[in-house]
Amino acid sequence: MNLAEQSWMAVRDALAGGARVAAILPCGATEAHGPHLPLNTDVIISEGMARRAAALLADEGLHAWVLPSLAYAPAEYAAAFAGTVSVSVASAKALILDIARALKAQGFACLALANSHFDPANVSMLRAAADEIRALGLPV
């Protein structure tokens, strides 16, 4: 189920209903993937991963909502290619931490990061962000 397609009242009611609700954040990038693939290849893959994970959890009677995707990330390896939009590690990490804080404040039980962008700077950033999110008291 996609969070962005819900009303705020539906989200409130789900979180207040006593069930533990997980959030899944698709993490991709806008970067070159050769001459044959779109710039949002990582976003497409991470969204598919997140939807599949939410469906598998639903099959087990668990509730998970897919958040709107992150389409910008550190993309240093592809930065020289036209169309690639690389953001700093600090900016990307700050955004993910802000999202996690908001989810925790609203009562989400945990956050899963569905990443398909494996630039080393991005992977390191996600690991560091996950450590900080756990320190906030939100399981990742």
Map each language-model feature to its residues.
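Structural signal for hydrophobic packing residues in well-ordered secondary-structure cores
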Residues: 54-57, 134
